[in-house]
């Protein structure tokens, strides 16, 4: 049976997007290059987060990133995030896996597991995740520390296995956004 959706109606992520832009583009639900709080909310719901977390994430993320990703533009109460400029919103106290331009730095990614995966070579336990966050925390950087903590805790809670391990391939997939697509597909296949 042929699909009722034409090729012109399907909006895809531009091929030239870097890893960080691809990560954020999942939340651009209509693929217009701008992420509004309602889209952030929809994206978090699509990957399996509850209403409260999705609401908090939409408000906090969009308020935090909107003005940073819209240089030279005035304040907007709709708190849009421009995907093309998301690199301008990279926060401190992070892992360094995204460089200043939003590109993936493989050596920094490998360093996460080389330094902090003590129990299993290719996975992090909750304790090891706390160690990672502590090691990456910059002095007097409350905001960056909170952002990093929130990102990693959501990832851990959504994706840890039955043994409480967050596997390397899962972490890798979050950096380019492909994990979000996988989670949405898994969730939609479970609902009637």
From Swiss-Prot:
Cofactor annotation remark: Binds 1 heme b (iron(II)-protoporphyrin IX) group.
Subcellular location as annotated: Lipid droplet; Microsome membrane
Purpose: Calcium-binding peroxygenase involved in the degradation of storage lipid in oil bodies. May be involved in the interaction between oil bodies and vacuoles during seed germination.
A Pfam family assignment: Caleosin
Binding-site positions, heme: 23
InterPro entries in the record: Caleosin-related, EF-hand-dom_pair
Reaction(s) catalysed by this chain's protein: RH + ROOH = ROH + ROH
The protein, known as: Probable peroxygenase 5
Tissue specificity annotation: Expressed in roots, leaves, shoots and flowers.
Protein's organism: Arabidopsis thaliana
